[in-house]
Amino acid sequence: MGSGGESDAGGGASAAAGEGGSASSAVDARLARLIARARAADGHPPFSDGALAELATGAREVVWLDDVAAAVRTVSDASSASVTEAEFVVDPDARRHGHGRAMLHRLLVDAPGDLLLWSHGAHPGARRLAASHGLEPVRELLHLRGEVPSGAEFAWKTHAAGEPLATLANSVHGAVDALLAVNARAFAEHPEQGRLTRAEFDALAAEPWFDPEDVLLAWDGDRLAGFCWLKVEGGGSGEFYVVGVDPDYQGQGWGRRLVEAGMARLASRGICEADLYVEADNAPALRLYREFGFREDSIDIQYRWRSDPGH
């Protein structure tokens, strides 16, 4: 059970985000080995980039169980009734021996209030484990994949004011702060993405995959209207990591232009396939991405355990 990123045409596409599961500076060798083993066995990372970025800033901690299971959970005040967010993974060679059940039990016992957990891929075993402990599904996140049109079919787009899209690499001082401000406004009601901090952004920017040329910025004069943040790790595939449009500019085609520009950037890098994450109930975003040829690949489910079932 783990956490992932999401995607929204008006609000954004995200994995902080995210779903990358790359080993940040906060990941020690033991955890990095477990992440690699789980990813090889499952086809997807066990932890989201957002969780690992929070681990780097001290907002999350690692909990181990017998060296075969690890959880990355938020650090909370034991005296408060705050919601604990966690995701955990069991070593592929140690599964079906009760380690997942034991880890979930520990997380439930330790949680001062409610507990939120993600299940990647909606595995039947995770469904049964969640149901047996009284966890209920509260969110669904779709993982979409699509082909990147060839460079001949896409040109770099300009936004409504006629100015070309910039990148983080060639933008003015303060562009990161502007991006974070738009991100917070675009994802104001988003449980993870909207709270992205500068420290967490810096942790993600320190990852080997980060390229400031892959962060596309749409300016309206001196105001940032939206951005498209891409993630390319190699292998011929790229991710629409975050697509965010300021609420004042939503509904005006900015999201579409940013996705078009993202496709053009990926094509220029020789990328032939793209993926992203989107909330299952985000109808506008789903319509937009399906128009670009994206189709559902898998689904993640978030479960919630309520410390007070009556509320």
Where are the regions a protein language model picked out?
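Phosphate-binding active sites in nucleotide-utilizing proteins
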Residues: 192-200, 206-230
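Acyl-donor-binding surface of acyltransferase catalytic domains
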Residues: 1-17, 77-85, 91-164, 302-303
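Short amphipathic alpha-helix that is part of the acyltransferase structural core
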Residues: 1-53, 154-194
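Conserved acetyl-CoA-binding loop-helix of GNAT-fold acetyltransferases
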Residues: 96-109, 245, 251-268, 287-291
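Hydrophobic adenine-recognition pocket in adenosine-nucleotide-binding enzymes
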Residues: 90, 243-245, 278
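Active-site/acyl-donor-binding loops of N-acyltransferases
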Residues: 133-152, 260, 264, 269-311
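Conserved donor-binding loop and adjoining core beta-sheet/short helix segment
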Residues: 21-25, 35-111, 116-121, 225-237
